[in-house]
């Protein structure tokens, strides 16, 4: 039932301006994964408990407090997963402290950013921090890993970024730059230094 509900969310955007931002958003969610439990009952119990826990959260926070509970919870879960992922974590997550420093550096000389871009955006944490500190109206990013690409799009939506104000593309920035002709006020990046890469001759004059 939950899988059907998630599919309906994606399908509801077909033919709409938001179709590209929601298409395949939940494709990596595997409710049959053995990581959720050994039996179907175990899996159902775990998923039910998560939904009940979310239902207990008071989302009635006044707007003046500027607290994004869902977004903060999502960021926290990503950070906890990254903490146990070792070197691989650098491929999809930038610690908040590092994100803040990089964001503060790129906004020097700018009262307000028109847009911000990350060519290796991972889960989008660095992009969101730079956009927040720089008050950017538009967010652009590209991510090679399909699963991490979906994480980034979810991160944008859960932080209240309107689908019309962000564009995250799935693809290798070196092989197929989706924003080659676009001008940006600021560019931030924490490249996946632990990822394997072959320095092909075609990149020598890139």
Predicted feature descriptions by range:
Residues 1-106, 111, 164-173, 178:
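Non-catalytic, mostly N-terminal accessory regions of nucleic-acid modification and defense proteins
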Residues 88-189, 194-205:
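Conserved S-adenosyl-L-methionine
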């Amino acid at each position: 039932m939950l899988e059907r509900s998630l599919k309906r969310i994606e399908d509801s955007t077909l033919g709409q301006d938001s179709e590209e931002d929601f298409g395949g958003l939940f494709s990596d969610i595997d409710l049959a994964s053995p990581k959720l439990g050994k039996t179907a009952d175990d899996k159902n119990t775990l998923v039910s408990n998560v939904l009940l826990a979310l239902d207990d959260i008071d989302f009635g926070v006044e707007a003046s407090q500027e607290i994004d509970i869902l977004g903060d919870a999502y960021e926290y879960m990503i950070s906890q997963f990254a903490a146990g992922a070792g070197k691989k974590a650098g491929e999809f997550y930038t610690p908040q402290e590092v994100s803040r420093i990089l964001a503060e550096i790129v906004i020097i000389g700018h009262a307000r950013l028109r847009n911000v871009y990350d060519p290796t955006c991972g889960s989008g944490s660095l992009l969101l921090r730079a956009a927040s500190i720089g008050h950017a109206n538009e967010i652009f990013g590209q991510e090679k890993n399909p699963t991490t690409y979906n994480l980034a799009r979810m991160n944008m939506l859960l932080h209240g970024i309107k689908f019309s104000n962000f564009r995250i593309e799935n693809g290798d920035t070196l092989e197929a730059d989706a924003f080659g002709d676009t001008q940006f006020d600021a560019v931030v990046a924490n490249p996946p230094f632990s990822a394997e890469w072959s320095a092909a001759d075609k990149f020598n004059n890139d």
